[in-house]
Amino acid sequence: MRPFIDDAKRRVDRRLSASRQSISNSRMFASVLPERLRNDNDDDDDSQVDFSAPPGGMGPREGHMQYMHQSIFGMIAAVGSRSGFHARYDESSDSDGEDESRARKDAENLSATAGALPKRSGNESPRLSPKPQSPTPERGRRHRRTISDHKLLRPFKLNSKQNKGQEPAVQSEPQTGDEMSRASTPKRPRSVTPRAAPVLSRMVEARALLDTEDSTKGAPSTTEEIRDEGPTQKSASALSLRLKEMFGFEAPEKVLVEYACSFLQSMLLQGYMYVTEGHVCFYAYLPRKSTVAIKSGYVYKRGRKNPKYNRYWFSLKGDVLSYYADPSKLYFPSGHVDLRYGISASLAEPKDKGREVKDFQVTTDQRTYYFRADSSSSAKEWVKALQKVIFRTHNDKGSVKISFPIENIIDIEESPMVDFAETFKIRVVESEETYAIDEYYFTSFNYGQDAFNFLKGLVADTPMKRSQQTLSPQPEQTSRSRRTRGSQNRWSITSATSQSRGIGKSGNRRRSASTGQFSFGHDALSMSPPMRQQDSSLSFGNSFEQATEASGILQSMTDTTESASQILNRSDVFQSPTIRTMRRGPSGAEKTVRRHSDETARSVHTTRNGPEIQYAVSESDRDTQTPSGLHPSTPALNELVRAGVYPLQRAAGFAEYLKTRSKQMSNLLASESMGYLEKVSGMWAGGGKHYGESENILPDDQAVDPEDLEAGCKDGDRFREHFALPPSEKLQASYFAWLHRMIPLYGKIYISQKKLCFRSLMPGTRTKMILPLKDVENVDKEKGFNFGRHGLVVVIRGHEELFFEFGTADTRDDCAVTLHKGLESTKFLMASGLLAECEEKDESESATAEHRLLQEARLDITGMHSSRSAMAASNELHPIFDDPRASIINFKPTESLRITCLTIGSRGDVQPYIALCKGLLAEGHRPKIATHAEFEPWVRKHGIDFALVDGDPAELMRICVENGMFTYSFFKEATAKFRGWIDDLLSSAWKACQDTDLLIESPSAMAGIHIAEALRIPYFRAFTMPWSRTRAYPHAFAVPEHKMGGAYNYITYVMFDNVFWKSVAGQVNRWRKKELGLKATGLDKMQPNKVPFLYNYSPTVVPPPLDYPDWIRITGYWFLSEGSDWTPPAELVDFIQRARKDEKKVVYIGFGSIVVSDPSALTRTVIESVQKADVRCILSKGWSDRLGDPASAKSEVPLPPEIYQIQSAPHDWLFSHIDAAAHHGGAGTTGASLRAGVPTIVKPFFGDQFFFGTRVEDLGVGICLKKLNVTMFSRALWEATHDERMIVKAHKLGAQIRSEDGVDTAIQAIYRDLEYAKTLAQARSNVSSTPFSPTPSAKTVAEQEADEDVPEEEWTIVEDDTELEMRPTVA
């Protein structure tokens, strides 16, 4: 994968070099263009002339036609850059003071390890661990296990991202097991705040007491003694060897039986149970993380200090629970909860008995978050989903392992829970010295009874074997060591259910019902019980240190053999056993005993990332590594040492508390003020930084301070912490800039491998943005909103544009080039299918290897019936069907429907409906198209019924071309000259739609929604351009010359709806009363935004906006393939073959039936541009001087041999034989050229052509020309036929469009939304007058006004209901 990435980067570097030229205005650099196309003076007469301009006198000014985007919304665009809100925010900010102080503290902690680190060659930054992992000290990850140094997985290591850039010398450097374990527990680079005493602290206290009792009984003091005592099985099977390595047994143990079963806790964990001679083991391979949202919905959240609950949209994706104030703005979270550091998720305690609980809480190592769902069932679903994520994050490497000795099993009994599976419970005692009992529940769908019987018999035979072992002292010693080892570590899942058990003098001991034990590896025995006595007595005071508070998440696996699984240790893995009260009592010292590997080795001041770092910080802790003979061996001496150490450590803990609480005051000291001022001044000075592979600042940046080079890795740590990103997300560059939303926000831009992030640095603001690069379509450079600033526009799929401003042009250009490099690499990985693999490969790679080795070992076993049965069971489907993507409801109606499609306009408006009706015919329905008379033969040719709608489309086209579609001048002329035309249109449409069960209408026809209300039938809308309100795109008839942002985009729809309705409201309401028998209506009563909408363009061309409701669907193009029935002329085929033989590119040029002021000049422009670009052209000349300037009438210009003129040809055949297409940008023509996968040049003239021209350019598959002259057109032709980047993008986009089936998707959408449309029709009819009664009722004016107020009250959308409309559409 790496060579492909390098190639992509080199390819981008060649095109996006340091020339700093405008990416949006100069797509190809001048050095690439041929000499004939270069023009040093672009301000000459030709480059400024537009030969495609409309006839003089038709526009209001300058003799040129003012199109729609210039006539209605000009005033909005004019005032867009007037207001400057930045002046009030010029004051310096200290919002990062806490982060800077924390980073400074981390730097001091890391400085002690510099001498122990191996030196690296070159500019590569030193790494804190020989393992190829990020040098960032991940917070809260000390309980995690590293995998790359495991002796089992080392030969099977795969090429992951973490291995890139690793030097062979470091990889081969030998390490001891102790060093590896210390290197695998990076410290937490975060100030830890004190929190409440843990729920399970009594369990830990009892555990400490147990350790103290164990220390008086003696045991072997070295690992070598224990290893020598256990006999090895030379004839062990492959499965036994794998289990020995995976579970850390002393010697291979014969596998007696295995079963496919599930471990039952708050979740059902499917895996395998292996019963060996000495242990019962369970292994489960966890599935990979999901990159899609696991659960989402509205939940109330309580503030940190404010007890009020606020409603947010929550989304649980990966390891992060994010919440948003607006679900349509998913790139701007209001906050997040990082579940990688989660402890528990549980329902709140009910205040009243019998009352359903809707509150739940999530506890992390930092704080507790309180939530409230809408119902108790929703709360339970959230808790269950959160528990699964927390469980998985604590087993992040992909597998879970449980192991406990058979001799520790007390009993086994059946525990029926479900009817279709056998469930049994195993009760296990922790060790012979304690009464703590763990319970494990296992269930199996096929072999539960067999497993229960076998284990019950095995448990019954265990006392006999144990009594036989006492005859020999050597086996007794081995057995005893196994029991000790088995009880040292235990595994747990967070559970709200716990049970209390009494243990001696330590009081009630609270135990999780799901805790268990597992076995150690060889390195676990390097600490003998005498050693354990010492560290249990001297680790008391460390509970006051900050690292100890967070170390509750840790598990005592520092000394164990590394494995791919993350086995959680006891229930204190979720709670820190920190003692808050400083009371003295008779048993206080006993309650505070800790294990060395759990607490004392994890102090904040202990730097353990290097291979030579010691465990402890005090002399008493260092004594734990001395020979066992130096340790006190009696309880009395132990108590004396403990009593002497207690006051000193209590005082040290209190001093640490004061030091942490006074960190803000320390920032104000004179010794720190200069560094703070330097950082703030640097923040406001702006600029940017680049980071290398190891996140060190690249030395070729301007004004790089040597201290910044050392702090580069900490920038990456803070970046991942700010946005809750995984360690694999490497920081590549950062810039200071302004983000323009409602007001300009000054902050910092972060660019990583797959993310573009922003964080506000303004006081009082908490804006954050997390934008995946795969959702970014393009990056354009534009002028800034304010004088002296330089703008950058980020175009996002299905979202409004983002505007950034930079202080200098160089910084802006550098950010643009860096983003384009990232986009190129991301899109290349997406196209090759490598991006999805990279997102999950690192996390599950080692577990997959371990799982594969275990499966291979299982296959090696022959003659074992249980193994074969387990293999068969693993291939069986789970009996519970739970696939959210599958539909269990058949939405297709049982009877055949009479469907009418109502549309007006040109051929391009009718063609999509023919394709849709052909699909409806195939489904068994009876479709009918109601349109103009001139399209009747074409419609009936395809076997579709036809109904007549009055109106001359040619006349309609004339006023659209001359005035712009639906402009003010359009409505003015239509109102003055076409009142009768609109009346005829409405009346004929009413007649054409009779005998209809379902009506589908283009909203330009204006009559459909009223006809559906009168007929009480479901009503759909369908159109070729955006018509529904959104912030992502402007209205197709109001596209500005420059991107104006989401607020402008949304207001264009509001203004257009009102202008469009006001122009026809009088005639429509008279028609409603006279012919339909309905009362007068308005926009607030019709509620057009509630109508189901079908857009017949591709979601890859116009991605669905995030703020579209569920009933608006982008289905894909409705193509009508007619090319197979068309025979091309022989001259056309010969022309294409000659061009191929001459190795010339072939382009298509056709602008449709447009009206220009000088058609001869436009023809000459086309001819000269084709010759200058050195291409061959197929010309469809439809422009004319109709209604133009009579003085411009000239003889026809002869065409050269490089151009072949045609009258018409099917687009699906023609575009498949050319290299590029240049046209007017109509919806149908644009879809045909994009479907063919050829670069597209768009010269828009009116209507939606400006919108699709902008989309083509934003997608990077073509060029949108604002003016048409020889200079610009010839460059565009040459670039479209020679720019490999554009050609590849167009080819890939064409393949995506061809893979879609827009007609079938539209039909399925109709089926799904049919019931919803029926409810709307019924609701409208209930508040309307009686239909089918053309005679108006004889009511007074006052009565009619009173009636008209009723539907307005019932149908007006209130603000609280908008959240139901703004649900994001799931594609």
UniProtKB/Swiss-Prot annotation:
Residues 292-391 form the PH domain. Coiled coil: none annotated. Residues 18-28, 466-477, 486-501, 1325-1338 have a biased composition (Polar residues). One of its GO terms (molecular function) is sterol 3-beta-glucosyltransferase activity. It catalyses: a sterol + UDP-alpha-D-glucose = a sterol 3-beta-D-glucoside + UDP + H(+); ergosterol + UDP-alpha-D-glucose = ergosteryl 3-beta-D-glucoside + UDP + H(+). Residues 241-301, 717-783 form the GRAM domain. InterPro entries: ATG26_PH_GRAM1, ATG26_PH_GRAM2, EryCIII-like_C, Glycosyltransferase_28, GlycoTrans_28_N, GRAM, PH-like_dom_sf, PH_domain. GO terms for biological process: autophagy; carbohydrate metabolic process; lipid glycosylation; protein transport; sterol biosynthetic process. GO terms for cellular component: phagophore assembly site membrane. It comes from the Eukaryota. Keywords: Autophagy, Cytoplasm, Glycosyltransferase, Lipid biosynthesis, Lipid metabolism, Membrane, Protein transport, Repeat, Steroid biosynthesis, Steroid metabolism, Sterol biosynthesis, Sterol metabolism, Transferase, Transport. It is a peripheral membrane protein. This is Sterol 3-beta-glucosyltransferase. It comes from Aspergillus niger (strain ATCC MYA-4892 / CBS 513.88 / FGSC A1513).
